[in-house]
Amino acid sequence: MTAPPWSRRVRRLLFLIVAGLAAACDGGPKGPGTRDGVVEGPAKLGAVVLEVTGIGITGFKGRGDTRAYDAVVSAAEGRHRVVLVDAAGGLIEFGITVEDLDAEPPLVTVLVAAGSDNQAQLSTGVVVRLDR
């Protein structure tokens, strides 16, 4: 028994709809944007100095009460030095502005940490988390 001629058209139409939906699912945000990050320590933090290395980094932003100051260390390597200061102390929130959110996340290293009392702290236990 053969299928009616309209069933081929229905199958083709369903195939085109499924193919179109699959093409529309691109896997997430692309293009420029900001990756949010937080710095936490075992004690109340007032400031940290970070080294941030990555391709396509265009700037840094403080979030909440945090202020961000940055300088390019090596443009060829995409290496930046960032000072994050939160006078109230506690959770230090910041953003990294990038050219492409789909690119690999930057590598972040804590160089120096200080408490809200301006006393240097060991960077052991100070953790930086970036969103993907």
Regions found by a protein language model. Give the residues of each.
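Sec-dependent bacterial lipoprotein signal peptides
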Residues: 1-25
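Acidic, low-complexity intrinsically disordered segments
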Residues: 25-132
